[in-house]
Amino acid sequence: MNLNIFRAYDIRGNAEADLNDTTVQKIGYVLGKKVKSLRDDEIFVGYDSRLSRMEIFKNLVKGLNAAGVKVFNLGLVPTPMLYYATKKGQCNHGVMITGSHNPKEDNGLKIVINDSPTSGLEIRDEVLKIESVNVQDELLEDTSFENEYLREVKAQAALKRSLKIVLDAGNGASGPLATKVFKEIDADVIAINETPDGNFPNHHPDPSKEKNLAQIKEKIIDEGADFGFAFDGDGDRVGLITSSGKQISSDHIIMILCEYYLNLVKGPVVFDVKCSNELPKLISMHGGQPIMEKTGHFNIKKSIRDHNAVLGGEMSGHIFLNHNWYGFDDAIYTAAILSKILSEQNITIEEMVARFPKTFSTPELNLDVDDDDKFAMVERFISEMKFKDAEVNLIDGVRINKKNCWGLLRASNTSPKFVLRFEGSTEEDLRTIKEEFELNLNTIFPDLSLDYS
């Protein structure tokens, strides 16, 4: 068994080699035992559009059933629908079979037990103890919360004026539901790559990468649309594109939402270490309390619950709305609320964002590293790095803060990569902090390629 599949947020690996029949059955059995220990015997399961979904589903059900737990099958749904079911349904446990934005050969499991996110690391040792799973009679029933979800989103996000909106689901799990939602809120919807297809024939469903947005940008301009939304493979991350085909950063998406929600209710706002330095300033300016947290939907959700936060957000596009909603990352609901906000304004997105302080930043940058060594490499970087006149933040990897710039280096929890990001008040400030990090990387890891992806 490949122990690297048990990660800090979830379980993720190659569908064929790592998530084989035996491994998935054991995982299902352990999860079932956790449910039974809470004196419950039911769980929701859903899956995204990946080609390996049904084989993994079959074996997960076998493991859960072997523990005496009945499975309510949500079918092919975006991850937020699984979360929604655990909030509204007859039990508060769920497993989503999804590879998120990993390569199409991968898959994984996002887990909710007793209304709380559960990481792969939390169950790893128990899975390793299981020698075999005795398959029982099937306990399986199909169910759906789509109609209830549509009604609730419509009640909260109906548009104040007509807007033409392009949706690109990237052939992931969000397409059919997203189109229905936007029709319900009275948008003029143009959907592309709507049909779920685990081959991802048009582009990879990762809206954080500019190369995956070429198609939606072209469609927005050709159709004269007001704006558009791109979703990731399982519908928990969103990208926003303007009428001129410009991508709006997640920093600015979170800022738009902060202005809106902090005008309704004051409270904490949680954000991850990759976010702009301007975000906590804006949160404070509008009467909120900024809370920086480790990257990862798992960490942000727990922090939102601990602090009863108004909302949370990550630079990767995970947005968590908690005021009048449920605090989980839901790209479709977030997109609907953003559309409502924009329908109430008499300005464009570009004009709205132009109000925010201008900085110069990179997108998320990745460097390939060995999966087994990445965390130790970050620790070595921290112990050997040399930065002058810097404030060091070690909440997640290392974030170096200087007067007019900052930089971040951390190990990805979901793939064999370093994650970096840089921001400066000027282009020169940005270049300076980036070059300072690269000098340290070259000195400490002379064999490491600085070919960013």
Predicted segments with their positions:
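An N-terminal, well-structured beta->alpha segment
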Residues: M1-K62, A66-A67, H93, D142-I165
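N-terminal small/polar loop signature for handling phosphorylated ligands or for N-terminal nucleophile
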Residues: E42-D106, V181-I241
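Active-site nucleophile and cofactor-binding loops and adjacent substrate-binding regions
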Residues: V71-P80, Q247-S250, F271-D272, E293
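Glycine-rich phosphate-binding loop
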Residues: N92-S100, K104-D106, I220-T242, Q247, ...
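Gly/Ser/Thr-enriched, mixed-charge loops and adjacent short helices
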Residues: E105-E223
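Phosphate-binding and adjacent anionic-ligand microenvironments
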Residues: V265-S453
